[in-house]
Structures are given as C-alpha cells and as structure tokens.
Amino acid sequence: VSKKQQFTLCTFTNSEYTHNTSYHCNYSMPHLSFFWLEANNHHHIRAIQSDLFHSIKKAARYNRLTLPSIPETLLTLNRLCEDPETTVHDVANLLIDDPVLTANIIRAANSAIFNRRNIICHDILTAVSRLGIIRIRDIITAQTIYSLKNTTIENIECNQLLKNSAFHSRQFATTMALICQKMHIYSNKPLKLEPEKALLTGLLADIGLFGLINEYSHFIEQGNYLDFNIAKYIFQESCALASKIVLSQWGFDSDYIAVATNPITTNHDSDISYLTIARMTHHFLLFKTNNAAAMNEHEVELDLAGAEVMYELTNMSELEFNKQLKQITHSYGI
C-alpha cells in the first residue's frame, strides 16, 4: 500500500460500510463519550453563553472543581505496580482484605477469556498469578470507575444523567476494547495497543462529568435556574477540560488524556493510537444510534486494517455484537 493510500475515509450507507482512499480527517473535536447526545446548535449556543459555563471555566482555571475520590486500595495497587520488586503475594495480600474485590478477581480469572484450559481457581493467589499484576490493576480500575458512575445523588435529573453516563460509557469502553481486539486480527504489523487499556481509556474519558454535575448542583442551590437540557450541552463542552484535570491529578498517562480531550491532530501518524480507536468507536456508535446529524459532521481516518474492522462491525448482527460486548464486560465485572 502506498503512503497516499495508507489512510481511508469511512462513510456509512444504510447498513453497509464503504471506504475511499487518501482523504483527510475533518474533526470538529466533539467529546467522544457523548455520542448519545443529539446535535443541537441552538442548545449548544445557549450553553456556552450561560453563567454556569463561565463559572465552570473559572473553577477549572483556579483548580476548584470538585474531583471524585479514588479508593485507597486502587492507589496502593498503582504504587505496587510501579515497584519492580512487587510479587503476586504482595497483590494478593492487599486484595484479601476486601472480600468484594477478591470475589470479582476470582470470577474474572475463571471467565472464558482468562481460563482457556478450564481449570477453576478458588483462591486469590491463584487468580492473581493467572491474571498478572497489571491486568489485576486494570480490572479493579474498571470496576471502581463503573461503581463510581453508579453513585446515587439527590438531584433526580443529575442522578439520571450519571446513570445514563455509566451505561453509555460502558458501551463506549467495551466497543473500544472490541475494536482494539479486531485491529490485532486484521493488522499486518504488530500494534502497541492493548484491549484492556482501550477499555480503561474509554471508561475514564468522561470522568470529569462528576465535577461538572457538582458545579451545576451548587449553581441551582444558589437560587439560579438553567434548563437541564441546556446544561447537558455545557457538560459536553466542558467535559474534556474537567476530565483532563482529574486524569492528570490521578496520574494517568497521555493516552488517557488524549481520548478524554480528543485534541486536534494536524500531523498524520501512520501508527494507530488509542485516540484512533476512540474515534473509530465514536463514529461507529453514531452509526449504531442513527445519529445522522452528528455523523455528517465527522470523518475518521483509518488504515486498511481499520477499514476491515469497521466493515465487519457494521455488517455484524445486533445479537452477535452484543454477545461479543458481553464477553468483555463479564471478564471485567462491569
């Protein structure tokens, strides 16, 4: 394949996928996790003109956004993963004090993906040995974030939005993992991408939403009024900045921040990144949700392997697609 043919523009026609060579990416840089929010220019303009939008920008500038807390067990586990002297016994000893985490890790170790020889393990040490320390960290991170997104708060509309975010974030993350798996199958060269990390970057992409919802709650408590339908577009517009703050303070690397912020890319790198996977996922889910208005505004660049993946997924039955996503969610307990 020549360099000129190395990238393709993906378009969708009904249920079929087609591609043409040598086109460019033309992104208006939406937040990738908000694929479910209908495009509405009127609401978007009112959102960025609102007092709440400017209040959020100011809170972010002075580092006053309320951040979700990260559990101590996960912080300790991250430190253990960074220590080259850490053993499986160290991780098992940390987890054994938390019966819920222990049960989830043993269940993951016995899932079809990680138990290919069909040997059931019943103790945490065997489970940690089978999965490996890094995968343990990834599974626990995924479960922690998913639990966090199912937190109940007093404001009914905000609570419903968090539930909605949890559902769609899981859909976005598991689809990222699935696309990553299939890229490894179709690519004719080794990829420096891991489905597990693709899943986590997807789950964490809208983590800043918690801080934004808190700002909205404070805004309403102070006697202000703002239509919640307008507030959703403020959340969409501000989520990249808020998520970047959270991920930076939690110590996540640039791959996570790139997926959360969807930065404008001017140089075309032939290497597929997690951001590429996220953009493919975003475009595919717009197709799945029949969000034609948003799809018309966005194009995504793919190499030939990416084109094959998108062709397979867009022609896959709903039953088979959901089955493959369910295998991923079951493995991670989300």
Language-model features, listed with the residues they occupy:
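A non-catalytic, amphipathic alpha-helix used as a structural packing/dimerization or gating element
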Residues: 171, 242, 320-323
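Conserved alpha-helical "signature site"
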Residues: 1-204, 211-218, 247-252, 256-302
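Divalent-cation-assisted or electrostatically stabilized phosphate/pyrophosphate-binding catalytic cores
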Residues: 123-126, 160, 220-245, 269-275, ...
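Surface-exposed, interaction-prone regions with an acidic/low-complexity signature
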Residues: 172, 199, 215, 220-233, ...
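Amphipathic alpha-helical interaction segments
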Residues: 43-44, 243, 329
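Acidic, carboxylate-rich catalytic segments that either coordinate divalent cations
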Residues: 289-334
